[in-house]
């Protein structure tokens, strides 16, 4: 039985290889109509392709779809004929005498009732094709190595707004509905095709490079638009400058959707993200969209512009997006924030490694922690090794050379080696191939931060009595740093009515920043009665987390 399975696996691999060798899909135009009542979708498709080798069959991935009115047209002769098409469980196979060097267009109608990927949530409809799932709602290609230009049209009731990939070109009335038409110019893998439907309001701005950025909120959340999208323009401008390659698409849009499965998804030109990140100005201090905002925008270059050939190279998507999001946060919040986040991810990675669960970055089945955080650490360490100038040049050359193509890790490393003045073999072994997290290297890097040195010194005082560390705790509380003050409060928790501890806690309530004060509210063993009346003032802090914790203490 084992050998039968292996044979089937081999044959499946050959079929995929043969498909990419015999046909190059170029463009797919579709007009789709989602039906919220039936939770179904139907549409018309025109897909253009070029035949590379003679074949009698090509296919599109399509899960449990019904098709009709299938026709084949030669682009050169404009002749059209009916052809045979077979709809299988997860594919549509088109049968004809396809000639090499010829371009064809196949048109057909389809309908489906997807069990996943197309979601109906109240008054919203949205898609999530991450990986290879777009074929559940749109005949397309699961293989991300075959990119196409996608132009979508979406038919919805007149009172709804549609957001999809590319530039919205027209909105046409169709009886009780409207057809929203979108245009893309450059190719992308099918998993990044998306649309969202809902009652949305829009605000927009233009970047320095003249890219229009559209920011959507539900009509009921218009007043939350500014805090939700705070720093978006700064992030965009920073990433374009830092990456050194202009934003590679026509538009950029961001859309919150209800009951989203992830924090965010980097659909080309149209990021969808969880409605949980839609906040007011107070909520911004507790949980905000900024990290996800920067991460998904970075994917427009890393993942969308250049796309992995297979999961072995998935860190080229997630590691890069995580790293560049960190750089954007450093630009906004400062270097201390950057090093603090690196430190926290290092702690998680070291814990995983200590448990014997460490993973190599080039393991295609690695966890998100590895792809995202270890990937970001790998880039941080590479940049330290080869220097800013070489690093930025390598990234720029890599993106420009492989724009709108598929890439491997070796493709990136070749560009690094071409500009680096040092040998990177040891870095590759330590950060890409080694399963264990290189904690010693990481902590040596962290110690280049003056803030991290102060933090490590403060942590070393945890077992010391109050009288031996009063001055250090006082300095931490009075510092501008969010994290030193919180560590000081952690060390004071449980000291009860110690005179020096009380003085320090009262100082923190009077002079500490928002997060130092929050640490008091969240600490389980605070002498609340002895800290009154200052303690009750925490109820007015600009943090719902602080207010709620104070209320229930």
Annotate each predicted stretch with a short phrase.
Residues 1-22:
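Bacterial Sec-dependent N-terminal signal peptides
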Residues 118, 128, 133-134, 152, ...:
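Juxtacatalytic substrate-recognition/specificity segment
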Residues 312-380, 384-385, 402, 419, ...:
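Acidic/His/Gly-enriched intrinsically disordered linker/tail segments
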Residues 93, 227-234, 238, 288, ...:
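Extracytoplasmic/secreted proteins, especially bacterial periplasmic and envelope-associated proteins
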Residues 17-247:
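Acidic/His-enriched low-complexity segments
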Residues 406-538, 543-553:
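Beta/coil-rich, acidic/histidine-enriched accessory regions frequently appended to metallopeptidases
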Residues 366, 375-402, 455, 465-481:
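Long hydrophobic segments that form regular secondary structure
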């Amino acid at each position: 039985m084992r050998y039968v399975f292996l044979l089937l696996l081999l044959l499946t691999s050959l079929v995929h290889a043969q498909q990419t060798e015999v046909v190059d899909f170029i463009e797919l135009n579709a007009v789709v109509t989602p039906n919220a009542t039936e939770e179904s979708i139907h549409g018309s498709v025109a897909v253009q392709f070029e035949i590379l080798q003679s074949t009698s069959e090509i296919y599109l991935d399509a899960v449990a779809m019904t098709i009709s009115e299938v026709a084949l047209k030669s682009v050169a002769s404009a002749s059209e004929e009916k052809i045979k098409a077979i709809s299988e469980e997860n594919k549509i196979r088109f049968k004809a005498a396809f000639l090499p060097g010829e371009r064809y267009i196949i048109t057909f109608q389809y309908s489906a009732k997807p069990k996943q990927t197309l979601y109906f949530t109240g008054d919203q409809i949205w898609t999530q094709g991450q990986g290879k799932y777009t074929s559940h709602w749109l005949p397309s290609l699961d293989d991300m190595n075959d990119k196409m230009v996608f132009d979508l049209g979406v038919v919805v009731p007149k009172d709804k707004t549609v957001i999809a990939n590319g530039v919205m070109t027209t909105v046409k009335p169709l009886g009780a509905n409207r057809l929203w038409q979108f245009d893309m110019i450059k190719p992308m893998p099918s998993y990044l095709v998306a649309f969202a439907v809902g009652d949305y309001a829009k605000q927009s701005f233009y970047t320095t490079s003249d890219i229009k950025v559209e920011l959507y909120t539900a009509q009921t959340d218009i007043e939350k638009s500014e805090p939700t999208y705070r720093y978006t323009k700064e992030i965009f401008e920073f990433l374009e400058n830092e990456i050194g390659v202009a934003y590679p698409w026509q538009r950029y849009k961001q859309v919150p959707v209800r009951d989203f499965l992830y924090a965010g998804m980097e659909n080309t030109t149209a990021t969808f993200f969880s409605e949980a990140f839609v906040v007011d100005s107070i909520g911004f201090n507790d949980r905000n969209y900024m990290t996800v905002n920067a991460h998904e925008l970075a994917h427009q270059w890393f993942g969308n512009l250049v796309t992995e050939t297979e999961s072995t190279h998935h860190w080229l998507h997630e590691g890069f997006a995580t790293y560049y999001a960190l750089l954007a946060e450093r630009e906004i919040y400062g270097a201390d924030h950057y090093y603090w986040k690196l430190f926290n991810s290092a702690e998680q990675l070291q814990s995983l490694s200590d448990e014997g669960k460490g993973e190599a970055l080039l393991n295609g089945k690695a966890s998100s922690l590895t792809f995202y955080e270890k990937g970001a650490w790998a880039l941080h360490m590479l940049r330290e090794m080869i220097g800013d100038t070489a690093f930025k040049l390598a990234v720029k050359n890599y993106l420009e050379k492989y724009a709108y193509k598929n890439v491997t890790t070796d493709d990136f490393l070749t560009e690094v080696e071409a500009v680096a003045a040092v040998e990177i073999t040891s870095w590759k072994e330590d950060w890409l191939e080694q399963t264990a997290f290189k904690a010693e290297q990481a902590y040596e890097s962290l110690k280049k931060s003056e803030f991290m040195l102060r933090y490590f010194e403060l942590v070393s005082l945890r077992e010391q009595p109050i009288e031996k560390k009063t001055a250090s705790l006082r300095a931490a509380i009075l510092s501008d740093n969010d994290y030193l003050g919180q560590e000081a409060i952690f060390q004071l928790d449980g000291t009860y009515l110690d005179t020096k501890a009380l003085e320090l806690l009262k100082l923190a309530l009077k002079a500490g920043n928002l997060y130092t004060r929050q640490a008091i509210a969240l600490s389980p063993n605070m002498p609340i009665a002895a800290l009154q009346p200052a303690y009750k003032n925490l109820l007015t802090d600009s943090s719902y987390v602080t207010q709620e914790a104070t209320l229930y203490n």
